[in-house]
């Protein structure tokens, strides 16, 4: 017992024994279990007195952590916090810390100076007499819609015209409407005064205000000489296109047709494209990209664009950057009902469109003179039209936008946004003339807004009034000579007027500017074409740049109305097309077809009409058309009844809505400029009828061939092709367009006509 006692005690013997004696060490070792038990008991005892052990603390920590996790899950699951609203407010309210603090402490503003400071503290503590309050006007930027803050760029010089605008809007013709758009591939954007609404723009259909019934009149060899509406389907709807077909509403034209008429017709192919919901439903997913590129131009034609050109072209939009300012969309009355407006808008932003429509309709009923309520209603109807793909609802939205702009005391920015959006939606429905009237009124209200004038020029082009458009762009360039958008459009008009050399600098400088709306395949197309015609070898540099920027499938294949993934090669064999029966029938009956063509040439009432698309450098070239855009010309077929009867058996050609069937006669001394057709959706057959022994040839891409009587040549006219007729007598061929063999039956039914 002594060793244990010594070990427990504090004497020196214990110390020496444990350190120096082996016995002590053994003794100490034998006594350790008891010591450990006592220590353990002592530890438990101390733990009860002193608090939780380490393991108990960790257990409670984990319980609390898990409780927090499950609480967070419950908050998200039961939607206790509206995170979308939080994020929206975080984005919209860009106030710095001092502004936030002033907002919080503003209620303690005792001296009426608009903020909380030392003087306010003195007043509250009774150290200073509180002054009489002065009437103050709350800052407009604190009272505007948070959901519309980023929609507007202030126009220079337009800050003091709100009162003036109402009087002018009241005098507007009630038949004019408009609305704001986002990126109409691209809505032509302007400089600082351009408003920037946050609403998306729908894909639209090519709709012109004119439609000429097909007779025996001139039929145009389709080229890219006209400014078309692109047939690209909206990404949001691309999956629906294959399954849905609706009738198109097109009040300004009897059928959706892409018209190739450089002299008269402009149709937009920007990312801003036009097609109403009914037409959009049976569109297909088109693209300007075709996968195969079998041919490239010669080495000398593949030189890259000069570095300075590449640099400018690769940085579009930087030049035109302007500082955005917050819009002034609430008048004094709307500020008093801002909470109600925000609550309704919250429903719209959360995708509860039907509820939002009802909420805004109730606000319009309660406050009929509120521009904000009316504008919100128009936006909801706009969204609902997109959701339901309804032209009828969209027409209601168009009317409501006009109502919002026409209300008393409507803020200037709201007027501009409402009318711009209405104009865009009118174009979407094909109401080109109504949209033009709206744009005219916008320019009348905002004469210093260059972007609106540029839009007005496009409006004139869309109805074929190139002369008026030219005047608009001349006015723009006189004020802003470096406006790239105005330059490319002015250059386009000059080229359409056959002022080839004069058009080149405008097209070139406009593209190089990098301004919004200038990076467009049509402008690369026309610039290269103009350069080719004046012998400028830089043409292929611009074609190459257009290809690099995704506008052309290749340097050779420069069509703009394309379906992605179709086999692409310049020359085809009958077996490759799958239309061997048609080819055999044409070749077996070539003399019958020839004789009816020759008989038509002898008639005096003009069945053959001159080509009028400015494709000829020189010479005489005429055509006699039997089918166009998949429609039979009954009057023309009276002049070639057997030929028409023969072709009725082959729907791949008679039903080709993107092609023609026609006789073509070319007289000696004719040269047709290099050109391309508008689409990759067709192939073109040439049946030789009367072919001189030498002097007639056709080049497609980099291969040149000649015709033979009674034989069919097949090529893809979306590739560059060129024709020479240097024989001593006329050349007569029969042209038969067929659908590209890889198009599906649905695509053949639904693709808009060209």
UniProtKB/Swiss-Prot annotation:
Q: What is its EC number?
A: 1.14.11.16
- Binding site residues for 2-oxoglutarate: 621, 664, 684-686, 731
Compositional bias annotation for Low complexity: 14-34
PROSITE patterns from the xrefs? TPR, TPR_REGION
- Catalysis: reaction(s): L-aspartyl-[protein] + 2-oxoglutarate + O2 = 3-hydroxy-L-aspartyl-[protein] + succinate + CO2
Cofactor (UniProt): Fe cation
Q: How does it sit in the membrane?
A: Single-pass type II membrane protein
**InterPro entries reported in the protein's UniProt record:** Asp-B-hydro/Triadin_dom, Asp/Arg/Pro-Hydrxlase, ASPH, IPNS-like_sf, TPR-like_helical_dom_sf, TPR_rpt
Query: Which chain regions cross the lipid bilayer?
Result: 57-77
User: Mind telling me which PANTHER family this protein's record contains?
Assistant: ASPARTYL/ASPARAGINYL BETA-HYDROXYLASE, ASPARTYL_ASPARAGINYL BETA-HYDROXYLASE
**Annotated protein name in UniProt:** Aspartyl/asparaginyl beta-hydroxylase
């Amino acid at each position: 017992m002594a060793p244990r006692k010594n070990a427990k005690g504090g004497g020196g013997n214990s110390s020496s024994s444990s350190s120096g004696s082996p016995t002590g060490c053994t003794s100490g070792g034998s006594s350790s279990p008891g010591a450990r038990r006592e220590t353990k008991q002592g530890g438990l005892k101390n733990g009860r007195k002193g608090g939780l052990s380490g393991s108990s603390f960790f257990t409670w920590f984990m319980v609390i952590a898990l409780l927090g996790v499950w609480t967070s899950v419950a908050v998200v699951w039961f939607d206790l916090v509206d995170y979308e609203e939080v994020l929206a407010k975080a984005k919209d309210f860009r106030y710095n810390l001092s502004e936030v603090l002033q907002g919080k402490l503003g209620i303690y503003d005792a001296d009426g100076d608009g903020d909380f400071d030392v003087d306010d503290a003195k007043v509250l503590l009774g150290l200073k007499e509180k002054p009489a309050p002065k009437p103050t006007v709350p800052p407009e930027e604190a009272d505007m819609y948070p959901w519309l803050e980023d929609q507007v760029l202030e126009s220079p010089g337009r800050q003091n015209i709100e009162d003036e605008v109402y009087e002018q809007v009241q005098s507007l013709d009630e038949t004019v409407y408009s609305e704001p758009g986002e990126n109409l591939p691209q809505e032509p954007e302007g400089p600082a005064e351009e408003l920037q609404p946050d609403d998306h723009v729908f894909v639209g259909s090519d709709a012109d205000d004119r439609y000429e019934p097909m007779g025996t009149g001139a039929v145009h060899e389709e080229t890219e000489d006209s400014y078309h509406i692109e047939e690209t389907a909206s990404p949001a709807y691309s999956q629906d296109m294959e399954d849905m077909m609706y009738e198109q509403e097109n009040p300004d034209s009897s059928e959706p047709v892409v018209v190739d008429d450089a002299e008269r017709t402009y149709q937009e192919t920007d990312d801003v494209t036009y097609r109403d919901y009914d037409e959009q439903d049976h569109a297909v997913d088109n693209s300007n990209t075709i996968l195969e590129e079998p041919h490239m131009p010669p080495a000398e034609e593949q030189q890259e664009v000069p570095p300075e050109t590449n640099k400018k072209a690769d940085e579009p939009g930087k030049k035109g950057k302007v500082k955005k300012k917050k819009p002034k969309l609430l008048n004094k009355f709307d500020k008093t009902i801002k909470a109600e407006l925000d609550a309704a808008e919250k429903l719209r932003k959360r995708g509860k469109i039907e509820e939002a429509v009802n909420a805004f309709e109730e606000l319009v009923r309660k406050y009929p003179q509120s521009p904000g309520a009316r504008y919100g209603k128009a936006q909801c109807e706009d969204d609902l039209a997109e959701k339901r793909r309804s032209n009828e609802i969209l027409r209601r939205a168009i009317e409501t936008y006009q109502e919002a702009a026409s209300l008393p005391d409507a803020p200037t920015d709201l007027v501009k946004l409402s009318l711009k959006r209405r104009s865009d939606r009118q174009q979407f429905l094909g109401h080109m003339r109504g949209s033009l009237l709206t744009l005219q009124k916008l320019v009348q209200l905002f004469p210093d807004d260059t972007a609106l004038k540029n839009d007005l020029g496009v409006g004139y082009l869309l109805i074929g009034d190139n002369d008026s458009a030219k005047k608009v762009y001349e006015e723009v360039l006189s004020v802003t000579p470096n406006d790239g958008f105005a330059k490319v459009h002015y250059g386009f008009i000059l080229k359409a007027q056959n002022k080839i050399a004069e058009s080149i600098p405008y097209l070139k400088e406009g593209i190089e500017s990098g301004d919004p709306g200038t990076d467009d395949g049509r402008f690369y197309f026309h610039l290269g074409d103009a350069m080719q015609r004046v012998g400028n070898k830089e043409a292929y540099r611009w074609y190459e740049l257009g290809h690099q920027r995704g506008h052309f499938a290749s340097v050779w294949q420069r069509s703009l109305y394309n379906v992605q993934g179709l086999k692409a090669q310049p020359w085809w064999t009958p077996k490759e097309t799958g239309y061997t029966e048609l080819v055999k029938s044409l070749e077996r009956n070539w003399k019958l077809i020839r004789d009816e063509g020759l008989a038509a040439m002898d008639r005096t009432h003009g069945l053959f009409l001159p080509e009028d698309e400015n494709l000829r450098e020189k010479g005489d070239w005429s055509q006699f058309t039997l089918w166009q855009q998949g429609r039979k010309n009954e009057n023309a077929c009276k002049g070639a009844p057997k030929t028409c009867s023969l072709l009725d058996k082959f729907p791949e050609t008679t039903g080709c809505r993107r092609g023609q069937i026609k006789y073509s006669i070319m007289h000696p001394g004719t040269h047709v400029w290099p050109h391309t057709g508008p689409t990759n959706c067709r192939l073109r057959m040439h049946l030789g009828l009367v072919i001189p022994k030498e002097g007639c040839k056709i080049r497609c891409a980099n291969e040149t061939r000649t015709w033979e009587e009674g034989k069919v040549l097949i090529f893809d006219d979306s590739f560059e092709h060129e024709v020479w007729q240097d024989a001593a007598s006329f050349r007569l061929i029969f042209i038969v367009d067929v659908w590209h063999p890889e198009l599906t039956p649905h695509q053949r039914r639904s693709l808009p006509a060209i």
